[in-house]
Amino acid sequence: MELNIAENRNHLNYSKWMYVKRILWTFGYRNTILRLFGAKIGKHVHIYSSTVIWFPWNLEIGDWSAIGEETLIYNLGKVTIGEKATVSHRVHVCAGTHDYTDPALPLLRPEIRIGNQTWICANTFIGPDIEIGEGAVIGAGTVMVKDAEPWGVYAGNPAKYIKKRILKK
């Protein structure tokens, strides 16, 4: 039996809601809505529909970057993501915390900066007041509680420097 690819592609494989969701939340449409709420989003940016962004006015993303599915950007403080950066699915970017030295636990809003050409792999946690240097790779499931140097590869809980990232020519 041969597979009929054309028939399969024309068949409705998803619920009507899934098709409506895909139309309503295309990258361009979602980016436009985020911009209307104050986000600064570059050209050719892909932000998946299941991404949660708490405060669009505290978000800046450079050209050609992508934010994966089910990513949580808790941006009480400003979150800046550089150009050609990839934030994979289910990443938690947490630009909010509390001052645990104060009995009242006041809310703090430190910034997070993610550099150009970085790759934040799936299920990673980026803590408050962290800078991910240009070209760095943060391995899947990593917990970042300290800055990452440019062009470094990091992994683990807590994150540890693994090696230098060297691009092939």
Give the residues covered by each predicted segment.
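Left-handed beta-helix
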Residues: 43, 48-49, 54-55, 62-63, ...
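Terminal amphipathic alpha-helical/low-complexity segments used for targeting or macromolecular assembly
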Residues: 1-44, 84, 117, 135, ...
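A short acidic, helix-capping loop that chelates divalent metal ions and anchors anionic groups
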Residues: 100-103
